[in-house]
Amino acid sequence: MVNAEEQQYLNLVQYIINHGEDRPDRTGTGTLSVFAPSPLKFSLRNKTFPLLTTKRVFIRGVIEELLWFIRGETDSLKLREKNIHIWDANGSREYLDSIGLTKRQEGDLGPIYGFQWRHFGAEYIDCKTNYIGQGVDQLANIIQKIRTSPYDRRLILSAWNPADLEKMALPPCHMFCQFYVHIPSNNHRPELSCQLYQRSCDMGLGVPFNIASYALLTCMIAHVCDLDPGDFIHVMGDCHIYKDHIEALQQQLTRSPRPFPTLSLNRSITDIEDFTLDDFNIQNYHPYETIKMKMSI
């Protein structure tokens, strides 16, 4: 049986290769790009977890980065200590100097995702400052509203803060999401769905990671709110393939997607900050081998 949900990702990759607009980009690599393709939709029901199978996705990196966001952390060295290097380039001394952040210590990424999720509107000093009680804790507010007012239409998590963009090592690509609680009329359990808007979508490296990350966040919030996961919907703006990824993606397109794995959470948790790596159990993940692609910065 064809994995139709992963196939929609592969179909979009093929469409961009065939029809994408040739565009320059900030990194100088060059891209093929389309704008506002049809959203991707993934069911999270029955413990299904949308971890792409046509190449191996670094799930430990997905989990640890998300836990780092949830803690409100912005120091890439904390991830490097766990042998996760996805933020190394943007936190390097050379890169920070190149964008004018010469006074930042190496690894200090500025007020990026986690800071905005937990302290939106607070004044960013550095990655070592304690910001407890400062700014708007969007994540805590969402969880509280889901528990007390599940029909609320303001279950919004935004990483896009125009006042802070120049302080960030990299402005947020996955920038805004909305949660929705489905209250069934029958005896079924309520479900939590999430829709993400991503302004800049690197189809080769970033998007497979982002799909897994926001699906995981949805499952975690559902778990602490005693809901079942529903759907994850991925809405994309500038959806692009870096030219030096085309060959690798053409290789990936030759692979037939396999069934998605399942995700189980190993213990009862009511505080989202209590999750650790050991709480996530990915089963029946049988991907093809890794396909390496270079990150453009």
Swiss-Prot record:
CDD domains linked to this entry: TS_Pyrimidine_HMase
E.C. number: 2.1.1.45
Family: Belongs to the thymidylate synthase family.
Quaternary data: Homodimer.
Cystine pairings recorded for this chain: none
Organism: Pneumocystis carinii
Catalytic activity: dUMP + (6R)-5,10-methylene-5,6,7,8-tetrahydrofolate = 7,8-dihydrofolate + dTMP
Protein name: Thymidylate synthase
Pathway: Pyrimidine metabolism; dTTP biosynthesis
